[in-house]
Amino acid sequence: MKKAVVLLSGGMDSAAVIAMAQEQGFAVHALSVRYGQRHTSELDAAARVAKAQGVIAHKTVDVDLRSIGGSALTDDIDVPEAGGAGIPVTYVPARNTIMLSLALGWAEVLGANDIFCGVNAVDYSGYPDCRPEFVAAFQALANLATKSGVEGAGIKVHAPLQFLSKGQIVSEGVRLGVDFGLTVSCYNADANGAACSHCDACRLRAQGFTEAGVADPTLYA
């Protein structure tokens, strides 16, 4: 069976991506990153999702981005209750670049030719590293910067949620049997994973279930 590395945050998007990769016949190796995020309950959620969805392996890598700072998700900066103009304070500098680079490295070690991520450019918070241009640029990097890219078949970067709305993501996940009740999306989630219901991540998540006509399984504080 062909192997793939899938980035798994513990949120609803990455849970859906795992199911999509499995439907395509991939043996999924899930990769989570402990980057110093304040909402560590998402990593507990990642472990639950990995177990429930039967991945081949689940690895958590430590890269402490608190030493760099610059984000409300790592620093002592308040998370806003509503999205505003421009790039929000919840943007973590270079996070997706770092995470995809780790996935790329693990894929090379595993001999995998595919990596998956859950970036989304439709219903998202304005992050520059969720845009289609970013995914295309990282694909070019993967082609140039890896042994596999230079000597072999290369490593393909998949972003299957890129042009889906949150409602479409929920519908697709439900079709594939994803238990979204296991996931955590909230930027302010407590130690038990209970969501605040006010932040932008909570707003987008609730919007997705409403659009899909699916009961929201989220645990709220």
Swiss-Prot record:
> What does the cofactor field's note say?
Binds 1 zinc ion per subunit.
* Keyword presence, rRNA-binding: no
The UniProt keyword set, sorted, is: ATP-binding, Ligase, Metal-binding, Nucleotide-binding, Queuosine biosynthesis, Zinc
What cofactor requirement does the entry state? Zn(2+)
Where does the chain bind ATP? 8-18
What pathway is this protein a component of?
A: Purine metabolism; 7-cyano-7-deazaguanine biosynthesis
The EC number of this protein is 6.3.4.20
Per its record, the protein catalyses: 7-carboxy-7-deazaguanine + NH4(+) + ATP = 7-cyano-7-deazaguanine + ADP + phosphate + H2O + H(+)
Q: Example GO biological process term?
A: queuosine biosynthetic process
For this protein, the record's InterPro entries field holds: QueC, Rossmann-like_a/b/a_fold
EC class of the enzyme, as a word: ligase
Molecular function per GO: ATP binding; ligase activity, forming carbon-nitrogen bonds; zinc ion binding
> Quick one: which residues bind Zn(2+)?
186, 196, 199, 202
Tell me the disulfide pairings in this chain: none
Q: What does this protein do?
A: Catalyzes the ATP-dependent conversion of 7-carboxy-7-deazaguanine (CDG) to 7-cyano-7-deazaguanine (preQ(0)).
Q: Which family does it belong to?
A: Belongs to the QueC family.
Indicate what this protein is called per its UniProt record: 7-cyano-7-deazaguanine synthase
Q: Which gene encodes it?
A: queC
